[in-house]
Regions:
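Conserved acidic, metal-coordinating active-site core of Asp-based
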Residues: 85-178, 182, 186, 190-192
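Short glycine-/acidic-enriched loop or helix-start segments at secondary-structure transitions
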Residues: 9, 39-41, 63-64, 174, ...
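Asp-based phosphoryl-transfer active-site loop
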Residues: 1-11, 175
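Short, structured coil segments at secondary-structure junctions
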Residues: 24, 46-48, 56, 122-124, ...
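Active-site phosphate-binding/coordination module
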Residues: 11-98
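Asp-based, Mg2+/Mn2+-dependent phosphohydrolase catalytic module
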Residues: 185-219
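Short, well-ordered beta-strand core segments
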Residues: 28, 52, 181-183, 198
């Protein structure tokens, strides 16, 4: 995960990510609810291969190939229905949050959640996921866990060899398929319940602790 996992409480990338990740001697998959350019840019700035799961599993990039898994038609229709009921996604006319999204729509946490969920309830196969940073309106068939299976297959790595670290409900599907899973102390209840363990520290403090333990075990 990126937000809440490689960041500080204020949302900035923690400097320790640039110390710990560039030379990590195993594949690193950057998984996020953000649109595709964000994790690709992070991988590039860290000098890591572009192994990316974006939009909560809607876009996958592995071995130089990008696959768009989700269909944005139904999520976009839900947001239009939300607007029709008087709802406002809040982001404003420029809306850089959604500008590059290909499979889902993100709505601000300041928006009317109950109205948004009511609009989604009237659609087939659409879910609203609260990541703690936005409400993500997406297809029910899209998840980070399914995307990780796709990445693992492309890399020919057993799913049991993956260690997942995250902080919100959109990571529960990943925790269900990875060999080891850690919810950070700042994680929501869904992530905590799905993880194998919950760290005592929050944000990058917790992530750094997991990485230190993994390194110690490999020596």
């Amino acid at each position: 995960d990126i937000d809440g996992t490689l960041t500080t409480a204020s949302g900035r990338i923690d400097a320790r990510a640039f110390e710990l990740l560039p030379d990590w001697d195993a594949p690193i998959v950057f998984a996020t609810g953000k649109s595709f350019p964000y994790p690709v840019a992070l991988a590039q700035f860290l000098g890591r291969p572009e192994l990316v799961i974006a939009e909560n599993g809607g876009v996958v990039h592995v071995d130089g190939e990008t696959t768009v898994v989700g269909d944005p038609t139904a999520p976009r229709a839900v947001v239009e229905a939300f607007r029709g009921r008087g709802g406002d996604p809040i982001w404003g006319p420029e809306d850089t949050v959604n500008r590059w999204r290909e499979t889902e729509v993100a709505v601000s946490l300041d928006a009317d959640e109950s109205l948004l969920r009511a609009a989604a309830a009237g659609a087939d196969d659409v879910a609203v996921v609260d990541t703690g940073y936005a409400y993500h309106v997406k297809s029910t068939g899209v998840s980070k866990g399914r995307a990780l299976k796709r990445v693992a297959g492309a890399l020919d790595i057993d799913l049991g060899a993956f260690v997942a670290i995250g902080d919100s409900e959109n990571y529960a599907s990943t925790f269900a398929v990875a060999g080891e899973s850690y919810a950070l102390a700042n994680a929501d209840d869904t992530a905590r319940d799905a993880a194998d363990a919950v760290t005592s520290a929050s944000y990058m403090d917790g992530t750094a602790g997991v990485l230190a333990d993994l390194r110690n075990r490999s020596e």
